[in-house]
Amino acid sequence: MHKIERLLQTLAPKGVEFRKLGDIGEYKYIRGVTYKKNQEINNLECGIKVLRANNITLSNHLNFEDIKVINKNVKIRKEQYLKKNDILICAGSGSSEHIGKVAFINTDFDYVFGGFMGVIRIREVNSRFVYHIFTSNIFKQYLEKSLNTTTINNLNANILQNFLIPIPPLEIQQEIVKILDQFSILTTDLLAGIPAEIKARKKQYEYYREKLLAFKPLTPHKEVKKC
């Protein structure tokens, strides 16, 4: 924490810039593959594997149980294959608690994502930093407010691109990712352990996540009028 504070004092003494996700350079939001029931097959080796909403846990990790496989003749765009540093997000569901679930993709692999899913692809900002923002209360509160304006549980491109996020200097982003990933790994390692200990570690991660992502907004410089 002390290192973050020192970096903020050195690199962002006047505060941190906030920008809409859609205004960040090289930002893309891609919706998933749509297919028919009769295009599903049972052979994992002969088709294309599809990740759906149930493949992201409520704790924002990938779950490879119950993978759907579709025929190779289904029309798929190249950009719909998952790539390293993608943020996979649940964009549509009958249950509002599943909307906005995210998982981070650590490597390129031969999976696509279904029509009720989306992928956020971003380069100008550390994508792992953005992932942690999407797991935070910052995004949850924004989502609750945005979805209250519609009766449909659908996270569309407009909602996402208007999400305001903090953009601290890259060195600060990297340091925050390093700290939060350590807590996240500890929580994951304990999943087979004592429930009380798992709960305590999860609360610790959530506490530091909210604390580390609470930035003072950059105050625009105002010219002093001369008499």
Walk through the language-model features, giving the residues of each.
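Charged, alpha-helix-forming regions
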Residues: 1-227
